[in-house]
Amino acid sequence: MAELIKFEETVSYLLARVTTAFRNSLERQMGQIGLHGGQIFVLLELWKQDGLRQIDIAGRLNLSAPTINKMLKGLIEINLVTRSRLDDDARSTRIFLTERGREMREHIEEQWLELEENCLTGLTETERLVLFELLGKLRSTYTGTPGPDDD
């Protein structure tokens, strides 16, 4: 009889548990400023390039259109983004940051850095760099997105 796997001793198990813990921390931290954790990633994309099409945001974040639509509705409700139809394609919409959405960036960055510091407390600078590299490789494996050295 084959020996049963000890899930708790696998990298996948640890990664899943750390991801869950981080996600919960992200929700708490961003909730303090009225955001849900996933919405932050939409804002990150718009800070890189404002006026993206909704479908492009979904593609960049590897999320479904309904999921992005729900996130955008929440961001519109709290006046961080607006949605505009394209003149040349009535089926397509572009998403733009509002003034408030642009102004919130600094505050959100502060919250993010605090979250990151809490997450990495206890790791040396070298361990942080190694972790960053390894997570970049895992991201590349799952999404085809280049890792930190490939950008």
Residue ranges and their predicted role:
Residues 1-33, 151:
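N-terminal leader segment of winged-helix/HTH proteins
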Residues 14, 25, 41-44, 103, ...:
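Pre-recognition alpha-helix immediately N-terminal to the DNA-recognition helix
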Residues 19, 44-48, 109, 136:
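Short, locally clustered residues in the helix-turn-helix/winged-helix DNA-binding domain
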Residues 23, 73-136, 140-143:
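Charged, amphipathic alpha-helical coiled-coil/dimerization segments
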Residues 40, 66:
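Key DNA-contact positions within bacterial/archaeal DNA-binding proteins
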Residues 50-51, 62, 124:
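Central "turn" residue of the DNA-binding helix-turn-helix
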